[in-house]
Amino acid sequence: MTHTQIHRSKWQRAALVLLLGSMVQTAFAAVINVSAQENLNDALARAQAGDTLKLASGTYKTKLYIDKPITIEGPADRSAKIVGDRSGRTVAVHAPDVTLRNLTVSHSGMSLPAMDAGIYLEETATRALVEHNNIIDNSVGVYIHGAAESMVRENKIIGDATLRVNERGNGVTVWNAPGAQVVDNDISKGRDGIFSNTSTHNTYKGNRFSDLRFAVHYMYTNDSEVSNNISVGNNMGYVLMFSERLKVYGNIAVGSRDQGIMLNYVNYSEIHDNVINKAGKCVFAYNANYDKIFANHFENCQIGIHFTAAIEGTTL
């Protein structure tokens, strides 16, 4: 046997071991029913990787620290309520391949510097799936703190409207989470709907935003997509800053008190097929270079397009 054949054989054996391990884990995965009278943390401690905890309707007054790949799922009406104690993170995920589905998650701590959140996805929580939940009355709704390839979709996220806007958390905060997606959520009454910072290859699409400061707020997020979102009655719609190679299309902003779209140091990007209706300025561009802005519909704005500072190579 040649050296190449030996090397290939070793890789094939390794791949087979991984496949068999995955099959064994799947074969032995259990569904564990949990009632609201039980201790949810005890059930979580007993669960093995790959298991599903199916929560009955009711209130679970606890905080969760998830350190194994499992699924926690409630009834379709989201009547399984995980209620925190107003400190820290109500649900903190630190393992990969965790799914949270059909839950109501509330009462996180309210410290912005401490990154308190209803659901917190740590860097190790790669490929997390957060779907079909009510995430209400928290600081940040979902904090994606480095969890690459995570998905947050079809959730209802409502902030604490009793606080001043700048004291509230964002609906979803994304920090350095390559490939993370935020899709088809309804986000309201927070500070920003989605705040994306220092990340790349993200997709934010199909979301609805209302009663916020900014619908989408970008900082240092490159090679990403903002598409088919709806912003209604926010201070500003899509605030995109210090980012490159963005695709911004199919979005709607209605009733923005200031700007529908803001481009601040956004370069080499495409902004097209967006609808801006009723804003102070439909588009405000500051030092936005080599962008392509085309096929947009602007209506009922005091100023249609306002360019300032150095604008080079941008086409309209």
Predicted regions and their residues:
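N-terminal secretory signal peptides that target proteins for export/translocation
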Residues: 1-10
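Bacterial N-terminal signal peptides
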Residues: 14-26
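Right-handed parallel beta-helix/beta-solenoid
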Residues: 26-42, 57
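Extracellular beta-strand-rich solenoid/capping regions of secreted or surface-exposed proteins
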Residues: 41, 45-49, 60-73, 81-126, ...
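Parallel beta-helix/beta-solenoid
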Residues: 48, 67-68, 77, 86, ...
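Extracellular beta-strand/beta-solenoid scaffold signature
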Residues: 83-92, 113-122, 137-144, 164-177, ...
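Soluble, non-transmembrane catalytic domains of enzymes that act on hydrophobic metabolites at membranes
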Residues: 281-284, 294-316
